[in-house]
Amino acid sequence: MRENRSIPSATVIPVLIYPDVREAVAWLTEAFGFVERIRIGESHRSQLRVGEGGAVIIGDVRSDRVPPRKGEVTHQMKVRVEDVNAHFARAQEHGATILKEPTDFEYGEREYDAADPWGHRWQFSETLEDVDPAAWGGTLLTDE
């Protein structure tokens, strides 16, 4: 794939819709530690960077794009972090709605779930150890 400084290098780049792009970017950078990479207009879009190569685009509301309605879950973003407990504390400090406290799972991850003020669901995950998928009932189909 060719490089383009205008587009994040990640293969999959989710675009999440928020009613106020600037307000959402301010909250996501403060609460979840994202870094604003590119701003497109004052209220149109922003690209946010997270970790090593991860990216998300925050877009504005238009006639064919709306944020989730209260109580409606259409997706969940999974973000890998170095220290899930520290990340959890930061998210709580900035008013994230905690849906699930940090929990260790048999597949080697420690995770917590949160919602931002606009209803988007986020899961943050720290790798504790490398675990063979067969150990917890998974089947490895490709070695990437």
Predicted regions and their residues:
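C-terminal catalytic core of tyrosine-transesterase DNA break-rejoin enzymes
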Residues: W118
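Vicinal oxygen chelate
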Residues: M1-V15, V25-A115, S125-E144
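Short, surface-exposed ligand-recognition loops at beta-strand->loop->(often short) alpha-helix junctions
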Residues: L16-D20
